[in-house]
Amino acid sequence: MKSLNNKKGIILAGGNGSRLNPITLATSKQLIPIYNKPTIYYPLTTLMLGDIQNILIITTLKDQENYKTLLGNGNNWGMQIDYAVQEQPNGVAEAFIIAEKFIGEDRVSLILGDNLFFGQELSNLLKKFNLKNGASIFAYPVNDPERYGVVEFDRNFKVKGIVEKPKNPKSKYAITGLYMFDNKVIDYSKKLKPSKRGELEITELHEMYLRDEELKVNILGRATGWFDTGTFDSLHEASSLIKTLEKRQGLRIGYPEEVAWRNGWIDEDKLRTEAMKFSHNEYGKYLLTLIED
């Protein structure tokens, strides 16, 4: 598939979402609302901010139609959105094997469908993304690094290793759910063997690039916000924060129509058409203010 700008994106929205049962017995966790928008709008707009117009949504078979109903083929936002199925939760790295035809000869970014980012710092990094060789990941300081894949550094702050959920973390920098790769990621993924938990681990992909000295780690500062919204508490915290940012600070996050318009993918007439679909609520009214301003 030909890319609109030689960059492609994948949103991994599969999995069972068992930590959010019983809600996820009936729906995908990435369709659960975070404040006033479905969760998947947030990773989607993160990729859009990186000027990525070709996006593949990887879902379970039972949830795919719901995603198609919500997102369509992307034309309303000047994009191309395609879909693929991950039949079993066989690991994040399997996404690149599933997406081989979609990726073609392009470079690719992958974001986990339950990850929420915000902040101008990340937006600037994404816009500058022009990776031709190697891989680029994003690390964020956390208080509980044992819950995540962790980047370890030497005394000169050079990446020394990556450890998945270490019992005794040697670093506070967790690897977030946003990754950028060159085209070698397809072949590298095919070389992976299932881990002890039966999955193709994204951490092992990072280690392969690290051994080749082709892994770049971007440290995100406190000006950037990041949530892994895979638990009830984190969902509530993310919703509360988005509400506060929108109501008190006027900072709007996660509106695909707005990002598409600001990127020049749709014009004002198209933005107005999309806004009128929701003119009865605050979502649509906000989009209309963009034109009025």
Role assignments for model-derived ranges:
Residues L20, Y67-L71, S189, A238, ...:
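Hydrophobic packing residues within well-ordered alpha-helices of enzyme cores
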Residues S109, S123, K127, K158-E257, ...:
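Catalytic-core segments of class I nucleotidyltransferases/pyrophosphorylases
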Residues G119-E146:
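Conserved donor-nucleotide/metal-binding helix-loop-beta segment in metal-dependent transferases, i.e.
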Residues E257-N263:
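Charged/polar low-complexity intrinsically disordered segments, enriched in acidic residues
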Residues L271-D293:
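Short, amphipathic C-terminal "tail helix"
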